[in-house]
Swiss-Prot record:
Source organism (scientific name): Clostridium botulinum (strain Loch Maree / Type A3)
Family (UniProt): Belongs to the cytidylate kinase family. Type 1 subfamily.
Keyword Nuclease: no
Protein name: Cytidylate kinase
NCBIfam families the record matches: cmk
Record's keyword terms, sorted: ATP-binding, Cytoplasm, Kinase, Nucleotide-binding, Transferase
Superkingdom in the source lineage: Bacteria
Enzyme class: transferase
A single GO molecular function term of this UniProt record: CMP kinase activity
Amino acid sequence: MLNISIAIDGPAGAGKSTIAKIIGNKLNIMYINTGSMYRAVTLMALKNNIEPSDIESLKTLINSMDISFNGNNIIVNGKDLEEAIRMPIINNNVSKYAAVEEVRELLVSMQQNISQKYNVVMDGRDIGTVVLKDAPYKFFITASAEVRAKRRLKELKEKKINISFQDVLKEIKERDYIDSNRKVNPLKQSKDAILIDTSNFTIEEVVDKICSIIKRD
């Protein structure tokens, strides 16, 4: 399998990361969770008291970050940040930092460099429309806000994070609004992407559907 790239986009909590991860394993290609990269920038910015409006400090911060992946975990400057970037404070702030044009430009450049070197499956908000515009396989994964909130709540409870369903639903809806209405690279379905609503399907069913489309070619 040479020069394959798979773009998976969709809103928060649609299941795209889980789906992309399994597809990466099944097809033996590199999985890049671009959302983890924005979360890592958010974590480091908050730790360093850098506001989303402080563009120069954000650019300096990102240029100082050596980002890689170990399996499914994101490594920044040699440290595994996977657990830290899943905390509610990151959920509540990531869309603000991800909306900054200069942040997106720097991370998109990193993502495109990776895709030129490896066969990849990437998930995010702007993969099919910006990062991998020429990807032969594009999918837009979605589900109702309520279904996505239930899934996210289950994930958080498994991590012993106590939060109400209403708070998770509110956060999902707020992120949807910010992601879809930001000026730079908003969340939207690429015209040539296949739409899959996962509300009434299991993860396995969605993975099988996507893999059958890829293998068909």
